[in-house]
């Protein structure tokens, strides 16, 4: 039986580090962010719907989607954000499911669905186990400011636009505390995978 793991965390909690560790263990990772980019490529059904709803002003000169522009349109407009999610989420879910089924057919021991908004998008039904990568609030703030060159205000706004990390931790099957070293994180991950009988 393939164990389907949902990997999530808060913004800048170090989820991609853990995602990379899974890959190093030869466990396939299906990345929701990459799929979300692919499903809105020029000419795809979701792309056509976005242009229909938001108009050509969210396009670059070459006709591809101008993601930052679309992002700023929906960031401050709840109604438009919901409209966009209604187009993109089903397309992403469908593609993730397709890839997941492919790995299950291949008889993989485990497959990871790397979904930043696993809880917010109500996608927990796609996975068997939820693994949350967590950090302390001040670590999260510092990392986000450094990584995205955000002011404290901008970083706080981004963090607050997501479900609180402690809420995710409460709903997780297992939690990796990513405040320490890379080695410490790896040790925690290996212990969890042993517990789930995925690695020896």
UniProtKB/Swiss-Prot annotation:
Superkingdom of this protein's organism = Bacteria
Q: Name one GO biological process term.
A: coenzyme A biosynthetic process
Q: Which InterPro entries match?
A: Depp_CoAkinase (IPR001977), P-loop_NTPase (IPR027417)
Q: Domain (DPCK): give its ranges.
A: 4-200
**Pathway(s) the chain acts in:** Cofactor biosynthesis; coenzyme A biosynthesis; CoA from (R)-pantothenate: step 5/5
What is the top EC class of this enzyme, as a single word?
A: transferase
> What's a Pfam family this protein contains?
CoaE
Q: Which catalysed reactions does the entry list for this protein? A: 3'-dephospho-CoA + ATP = ADP + CoA + H(+)
Localization of this protein:
Cytoplasm
According to the UniProt entry, what is the EC number of this protein? 2.7.1.24
Chain residues that bind ATP: 12-17
Q: One cellular component GO annotation, for this chain's record?
A: cytoplasm
Presence of the UniProt keyword Nucleotide-binding in the record = yes
GO MF annotation list: ATP binding; dephospho-CoA kinase activity
UniProt keywords (A-Z) are: ATP-binding, Coenzyme A biosynthesis, Cytoplasm, Kinase, Nucleotide-binding, Transferase
Q: What protein family is recorded?
A: Belongs to the CoaE family.
State the HAMAP family in the record. Answer: Dephospho_CoA_kinase (MF_00376)
Q: What does this protein do?
A: Catalyzes the phosphorylation of the 3'-hydroxyl group of dephosphocoenzyme A to form coenzyme A.
Q: Which NCBIfam families match?
A: dephospho-CoA kinase
Q: What is this protein called?
A: Dephospho-CoA kinase
- Gene that produces this protein: coaE
């Amino acid at each position: 039986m393939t164990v389907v793991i949902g990997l999530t965390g808060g913004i800048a909690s170090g989820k991609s580090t853990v995602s990379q560790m899974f890959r190093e263990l030869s466990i396939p990772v299906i990345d929701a962010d990459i799929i979300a980019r692919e499903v809105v490529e020029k000419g795809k059904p979701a792309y056509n719907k976005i242009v229909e709803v938001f108009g050509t002003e969210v396009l670059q000169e070459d006709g591809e989607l101008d993601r930052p522009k679309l992002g700023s349109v929906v960031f401050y407009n709840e109604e438009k954000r919901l409209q966009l999610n209604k187009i993109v989420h089903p397309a992403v879910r469908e593609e993730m499911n397709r890839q997941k089924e492919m790995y299950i057919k291949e008889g993989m021991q485990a497959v990871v669905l790397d979904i930043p908004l696993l809880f917010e998008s109500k996608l927990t039904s796609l996975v068997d186990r939820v693994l949350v990568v967590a950090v302390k609030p001040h670590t999260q703030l510092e990392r986000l400011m450094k990584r995205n060159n955000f002011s404290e205000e901008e970083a706080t706004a981004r963090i607050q636009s997501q479900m609180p990390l402690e809420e995710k931790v409460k709903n997780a099957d297992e939690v990796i505390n990513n405040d320490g070293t890379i080695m410490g994180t790896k040790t925690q991950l290996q212990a969890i995978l042993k517990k789930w009988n995925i690695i020896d």
